[in-house]
């Protein structure tokens, strides 16, 4: 085989190797993004239930204008699903509660997808932690 043919084979192997590495990186980034979106979507649903609790009269099992007394059991019977696990993060105040979703995908060696959602009576704001 001539030198030119060997050089073309080596160049082809390098190009294929780079393409595979880029493809793996893109797949991982997409999986993280999809998990983050799914966790955020679940948190929006839980935030809506928290706001329902806030508005519901105490006689019907609600907070009657306060988040005080809200537990995760009042939001959902399942604290986890295929997207991740969910919890009330920190103390529940009368006018706000923070929900946390921890996803299944690892962002780096030590951290997984994590999203916090601060819920008030009229809004819910998501913050990406990882």
Which residues fall in each region the model found?
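General structural signal for alpha-helix termini and helix-helix connectors
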Residues: 29, 33, 56-59
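General secondary-structure propensity
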Residues: 2-12, 84-91
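C-terminal juxtamembrane segment of a hydrophobic transmembrane alpha-helix
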Residues: 4-10, 14-32
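N-terminal alpha-helical signal peptides/signal-anchor transmembrane segments
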Residues: 42-58
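Periplasmic/extracellular, small/polar-rich flexible segments of pilin-like filament-forming proteins
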Residues: 55-130
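Membrane-proximal amphipathic alpha-helices
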Residues: 32-43
């Amino acid at each position: 085989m001539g030198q030119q043919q060997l050089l073309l084979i080596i160049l082809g192997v390098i190009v294929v190797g780079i393409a595979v590495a880029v493809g793996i990186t893109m797949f991982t980034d997409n999986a993280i993004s999809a998990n983050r979106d799914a966790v955020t979507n679940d948190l929006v649903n839980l935030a809506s239930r928290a706001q329902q609790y806030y508005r519901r009269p105490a006689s019907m099992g609600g907070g009657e204008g306060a988040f005080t007394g809200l537990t995760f059991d009042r939001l959902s019977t399942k604290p986890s699903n295929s997207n991740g696990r969910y919890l009330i993060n920190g103390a529940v105040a009368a006018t706000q509660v923070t929900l946390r979703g921890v996803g299944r995908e690892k962002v780096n060696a030590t951290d997984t997808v994590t999203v916090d959602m601060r819920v008030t009576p009229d809004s819910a704001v998501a913050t990406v932690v990882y």
